[in-house]
Regions:
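Flexible, acidic/histidine-containing loops and adjacent segments that form or flank the divalent-metal
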Residues: 1-3, 74-204
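N-terminal start-of-chain detector that recognizes signal peptides
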Residues: 1-3, 26-29, 54-58, 140-144
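Conserved beta-strand hairpin/beta-sheet module of binuclear metal-dependent hydrolase folds
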Residues: 1-50
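Conserved residues at beta->alpha junctions
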Residues: 9, 59, 173
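Active-site environment of divalent metal-dependent phosphoester hydrolases
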Residues: 12, 37-38, 60-66, 90-92, ...
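Extracellular structured ligand-interaction cores
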Residues: 15, 55, 166-168
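A short acidic (Asp/Glu
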Residues: 17-18, 65-70, 94-97
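Active-site metal-binding motif and surrounding structural segment of the metallo-beta-lactamase
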Residues: 26-27, 36-85
Length: 204
């Protein structure tokens, strides 16, 4: 087996692809995307054939999440095997409920105003894009099914086996304290922009 690592300029954020190749099989991993560029779009179409085996969105800072939203909006036909997304989450560890109709309406407006391309990004928490990404994943049956909603990435996790002799993922960041800070910031921004409290109930 051998691995091919591809990185792309994505504003001040990250966009990393790893392809694990064993015999005739290829396993593709995408990690974050601050800006969905034409180069990334072409890579996904020509090298990955519009399929990602594992999409990892490490946290909801703008420079990690914006391009993922843009990718899914621009390429709704893309298939994804599994999704790890450190979505907004309560400190108790309970996940946020599926969006109410009222909140969904607010987020639809945010989605419509999401730019197709960003020329820069400030690297700060972005409530709009965090909500939009969750909404996009929940509405698409294939992506919704692929989203591991109980899996929350932090550096204290045990290594995650990929199976089929492909090795394992070792998580070295983010820390739980960093995620708690993001969670609190998100809850504050969510209330400010949607006028609704973050819902304390499991995902549907």
């Amino acid at each position: 087996m051998h691995a091919i690592l591809n990185t792309f300029k994505s504003g001040v954020g990250d966009c990393v692809f790893m392809r694990l190749i064993k015999d005739d099989a290829t396993f593709s991993i995408m990690i974050d995307c601050g800006k969905y560029t034409p180069e990334i779009n072409l890579f996904i179409k020509e090298k990955l054939h519009k399929h990602i085996d594992l999409l990892i969105v490490t946290h909801i800072d703008d420079d990690h999440i914006n391009g993922v939203c843009e990718m899914l909006i621009a390429m709704p036909e893309i298939t994804i095997g599994k999704i790890f997304y450190n979505c907004y989450q309560l400190l108790s560890g309970e996940k946020i409920a599926a969006l109410t109709k009222i909140v969904s309406s607010d987020i639809e407006i945010l989605t419509q105003n999401l730019p197709k391309q960003r020329t820069d990004t400030n690297g700060k928490i972005n409530m709009e894009h965090a909500s939009v990404l969750a909404s996009i994943l929940l509405k698409n049956p294939q992506w919704n099914s692929a989203w591991e909603k109980t899996f929350y990435i932090e550096n204290s996790l045990e290594p995650y086996p990929l199976g089929d002799g492909l090795g394992q993922l070792v998580f070295i960041s983010p820390t739980s304290s960093e995620l708690k800070t993001l969670d609190m910031n998100f809850a504050r921004e969510y209330l400010r922009l949607t006028r609704h409290e973050v819902i304390n109930a499991p995902f549907e």
